[in-house]
């Protein structure tokens, strides 16, 4: 955005269709799913023969990640596979039992609450815990592991910044101010990415309400938007 007195020109708009929920799902898949049976062996008897394969966790994971529909995993075609996993015993049985309890008590949303709390904690500390006592689940999560999880996302952000500046006809040095907004802007690696590219020019103010508040302030002071200057994504 370029300001000239009370007039503002949006030079270019662009963005990634990835938000905090996407990051929460990445955390679930990498750090939580292995504690629910992902990657374990599945032993069952079919027509008198003992068959062993990898447990088909992919059938469960999509519904676990979309917590409003996790209850649909209560169907027999899913529960029977979990029962096989529990009955086979061994170290994996505890994980399958945990998966059974998550589904029976519809605890996916509770797991995501714990993930969001841990993610927020990593904005200010180097290590935290994904803690879900209802499932006897406590997973240590450190900043290095979290940063590694975000590498693809950070690369996309870097590319998007380059593309946005190019389309606006600007260099990094032409940018006077970068405003961090939204919960994901509090993530340490994203903050450091922006500060490395725009040193001394990155600010944050009320990341969860700044967009709505900014529009209200702009309206109060009579700022005018000229849509003719905008380059769409």
Identify the residue ranges that each predicted region occupies:
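Glycine-rich phosphate-binding loops at beta-strand->alpha-helix junctions
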Residues: 103, 107-110, 173-194
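A polyampholytic, Gly/Pro-enriched intrinsically disordered region
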Residues: 38, 220-233
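Amphipathic alpha-helical transducer elements in NTP-driven molecular machines
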Residues: 20-25, 93, 108-112, 143, ...
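Phosphate/ATP-binding catalytic cores across multiple sugar-kinase/actin-like superfamilies
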Residues: 114, 118-121, 149-178, 193, ...
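Alpha-helix capping and helix-loop boundary segments enriched in small/acidic/polar residues
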Residues: 14-19, 137, 181, 185, ...
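Conserved phosphate-binding/catalytic loops in two-lobed NTP-binding clefts
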Residues: 17-18, 173, 191-216, 225
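Adenine-nucleotide phosphate-binding core of ATP-dependent small-molecule kinases
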Residues: 100-108, 135-164, 168
């Amino acid at each position: 955005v370029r300001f000239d007195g009370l007039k503002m020109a949006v030079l270019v708009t662009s963005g990634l269709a990835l938000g905090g929920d996407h990051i929460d799902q990445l955390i679930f898949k990498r750090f939580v799913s292995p504690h629910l049976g992902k990657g374990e062996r599945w032993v069952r008897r079919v027509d008198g023969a003992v068959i062993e394969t990898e447990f088909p966790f992919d059938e469960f994971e999509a519904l676990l990640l979309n917590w409003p529909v996790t209850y649909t995993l209560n169907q027999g075609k899913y529960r029977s596979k979990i029962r096989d996993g529990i009955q086979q015993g061994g170290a994996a049985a505890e994980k399958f039992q945990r998966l059974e309890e998550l589904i029976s008590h519809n605890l996916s949303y509770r797991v995501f609450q714990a993930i969001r709390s841990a993610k927020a904690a990593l904005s200010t500390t180097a290590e935290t815990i994904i803690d879900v006592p209802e499932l006897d689940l406590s997973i240590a999560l450190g900043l290095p592991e979290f940063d590694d999880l975000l590498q693809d996302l950070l690369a996309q952000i870097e590319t998007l910044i380059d593309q946005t500046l190019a389309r606006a006809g600007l260099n990094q040095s032409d940018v006077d101010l970068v405003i961090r907004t939204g919960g994901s802007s509090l993530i340490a690696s994203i903050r450091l990415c922006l500060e490395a590219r725009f040193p001394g020019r990155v600010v944050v103010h009320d990341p969860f309400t700044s967009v709505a508040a900014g529009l209200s302030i702009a309206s109060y002071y009579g700022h005018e938007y000229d849509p003719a200057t905008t380059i769409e994504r």
